[in-house]
Amino acid sequence: MSIALAFFILVLLGFSWASPSALDDTFNVSRSVGLISSSNLESCQSSPLEVGNIYNSTSASEILSTLDAKYITIIGVIGSSNSSIQDLIDSVGNSNNAASSNPTSTVTEYVDRVQTVTEYVTLSCGQAFTSTVDISSSTSSSVINSPTGTAVSSQISTLSMSPSSTPVFSPSASVSSKVASSVSYVSSEPSDSSSSTNTVILTTSVNSPAVSSSETLTSVSITSTESAYTSSSVDIAASTTASSTLPVSTSEATVSFSTDIPATPSTLSSPASSSSSYLVETSSTLTDSVFTTVTATSDSSVITYTLINSVTSSSETTNLPSSSSSLVTIGESSFPSSLLSLLTQSFSTVRSTSSSSTDQLTSASPISSSVISPSVSSPTSSILTNSGSIKSGDHQIVTTSFVQTTTHGSQVETLTYVTTLTETILTTTYDSHTFLTTITPSPSNSISYTNNTFIPSSSIKSSIVYSVTPTSAENYTSSEAFSTSSSLVVIPPVNSSLVTSSTSFTKFSSLSSSQLSTENFTSASSSLSLTNAKSSLSTPSTTIPTSNSSVSLQTSSSLIISSPIISSSLTATSTSTPALTHSITPSNTSYTSSLIPSSSTDYSSSLITVCSNVTSEISSTSLASLISTLTSQQISSNKSSEFVGQTTTEYTTSGSVGFTTTLATQSGSVPGTVLVDVPTPSWITETVTSGSVGFTTTIATPIGTTAGTVLVDIPTPSWVTETVTSGSIGFTTTIATPIGSTAGTVLVDVPTPSWVTETVTSGSVGFTTTIATPIGSTAGTVLVDIPTPSWVTETVTSGSVGFTTTIATPVGTTAGTVLVDIPTPSWVTETVTSGSVGFTTTIATPVGTTAGTVVVDVPTPSWVTETVTSGSVGFTTTIATPIGSTAGTVLVDIPTPSWVTETVTSGSVGFTTTIATPVGTTAGTVLVDIPTPSWVTETVTSGSVGFTTTIATPIGTTAGTVLVDIPTPSWVTETVTSGSVGFTTTIATPVGTTAGTVLVDIPTPSWVTETVTSGSVGFTTTIATPIGTTAGTVLVDIPQQHATTTTTTTFDGFSGYTSSYTGSITETIVIGTPHHSVVDVS
């Protein structure tokens, strides 16, 4: 009777990377599949297994309907029923997409996206087990199917099983992720046929930036007899127990447990004054995983280690003085006194059960002492790393690093390829048979170089060979070599065997299922077809007669195999006698397989093709299961991370062409090594090391683009980064700041010829600002690497070309540093410091223009500014007055050749007035920097040329200063002081005329004037008489009869407002004070 096993992998693809709380980069899968004994097979011979039964039940269909149809695909099937496979396809398609007219298209269309992994395993007599992990929602569920079709599901904290039948065995499956819950099933065969006990260890682990948590492990034991169903749960961390008993008539039994999620610290640490517990995974046998709790309790003098076996409940305790550095002996092993060293050096899997950490550590297996030399065609600068001693009966790992260095001018690029090869030799005794499993990888043809140029491995001639050779009437030996990172596996006849192996291997890339079309078994009497080209899946027959048969495989015209090859072989012995030879030669599309039977025994065989790239931890108890696991347990992922020894790797895929960059970080260190698996011509990387601690950031840029991806290999708690994208071409600059410091390093991912940067350090604390300017443009982006609370910046854009100036002011100071991102030839700046407190104002003027923008770096409470724009060309003048003083500094943004200014200081208090005259004109604008309540001014415009005279009188005085904005050759003034009180009168006469204008700077109550208009031409005479006297002075200033027009423009810092006053000779013109404008620096 043949064995029927069915593995279905339903893959839900598509990662989301839209926010910082995106998925963690770790996704490890390990699985152990048990063997159905021959006695159990006898009990099932009367009722052949039907794969379709799993899906034909109502409840199972309901469960499948909850899965989104567009994420489902079937990669491989092994079965004994001709009709059940099509039933399976119909059931899955109909359950997930009722509206689909072609279910087979539905289940095979979306093979390239992975986010949910569902595994179906057919047990004896039709039982099925399903384990589902949804990475995106951090949930997991389990389903156990009985032969009657009853299906029960669970979500993380609940395990449901049907007591109506006793499983012969349960597969041990473990799916773990830092963002998804992990459920581990450890099974044991019943001692008799009337009862069965299944022990389940459920692990909840969530490690996300948005969620703080730890792992909680609960052991659930489920015992089923003919009359009762008993379940008990033990919380390993809390040492609490709960149990319940249900009659067999109960349709469902549910065992629930709570998950305790305490706060999550950032790193593992040695035990302090409190107790710390870790769960370590060992193997007491070759088939069962044993979780052992290691607890370390320490005080000032003693460290106590306690190991508790979760299966046997046995414990061992060892005390050690805390000051001792010797090893601790527990059982047959010696451990160092450091708990962290104990775990990482002695156990394969370490998980925390306390609040100390949720990190999983995977220790490196012993290293092989044999030397693997680089191939003769490898570059001269090759480095061979990781060599050591081999431990009997264990793994031997050899890691080879090929380093290629290329020089382009002054730039040196380094490309590193790392290949990890694992050998495993295990011997297992089962009943009276001895089985030997050997996994031997080979680095040959892994990487080929010609003149230091990487050659894709698709051009390397290689083969996959699967051979079965009879060794005697009762045994045969099989071997398989995995090459080109994909597997084409033929399952040999296995009637009753047990082969155990455990290995860890990496497949860097492989064929996608869309590149495979049809694989055929052909013989004289029957044929088997398996199509993976998004069309159909059918199995007309699985019986191959005793005569020789041939196998052919048709593929697409091109096989894309662009990654290094890792080859390994499997050797096992079993009791079957036929011999099967299968060979593949990638150089052509012809594949042949021949069967050399030694008896007339019928058997079932299927062809499975799986394409993926992931690292898997595999444990198997049969040759068929081992091969199936190696092929079906592959998971395609755009972004994944695994633990290889004590090295953490992170994969990032960038751009539409799918280039991939890998960062490898040794445990216990912060800097990592960047491993780029794309040849130099396709991927440019630049690495910058910052700070004394040697933090490293690497930027990878695909050839032909100007923007790259910044890869930072330091965790968030240690390294703060800020990325700014500038301009329409998307150049990207990243600033990395070590925690605890205020200054960072700017990392620019574009070569110097394309991106010009200028860095300015300001102040004694060393704050740093960098301006990045794309080549060919005059405006850049200012990047400030200090958080807002420590550094205040204000950016002003001036003119139509968009020149930009930024002022950075450290918090707690009033003066800042002006950072200008345009080179000196394009941007003229002038900075004036005013007052004893060192307030600073800067004017920036684009080259080729006469007007600039005044940038003031002091907040409103400390600095009052008033800006006036004069003339049609928009000249701008700004007066800055420190708060608490009456005198300010006039800042003029036009060079001397374009703008003539004259400043007069009046009185003992130092009030200042400035007149600004554009070059080429005779009239200017008087700018007064004191508000009206402190400084009284009167301005008179005289004559057709618009000459202007202004008198400024300090408050509290009766005499003022006449400020004339025309040089002496154009404007004659005469000032007369009258009386003992020092009243002052000034007459202003335009050059070339005999009459002037009387300017009186004393209000009417102090100075009496009388004006008489004489004659037909309207000449005007004014007599001024000081108060208290009877005689006055006649001041005559009659201009020609022309109307006067005065224009005032007020500039509020952003817009100019202009008003004009036109009147007759005798009309009084009132000139309003320009709007008061304040520059608010925020």
Swiss-Prot record:
A GO cellular component term found in this entry reads: cytoplasm
* Location within or outside the cell: Cell surface
Offer one example of a GO biological process linked to this entry.
flocculation
- According to the record, the residues making up region (Disordered) are 353-374
Which regions are annotated as sequence repeats? 646-681, 682-717, 718-753, 754-789, 790-825, 826-861, 862-897, 898-933, 934-969, 970-1005, 1006-1041
Annotated keywords:
Conjugation, Glycoprotein, Repeat, Signal
Q: What is this protein called?
A: M cell-type agglutination protein mam3
Source organism per entry reads: Schizosaccharomyces pombe (strain 972 / ATCC 24843)
Biological classification of the source: Eukaryota, Fungi, Dikarya, Ascomycota, Taphrinomycotina
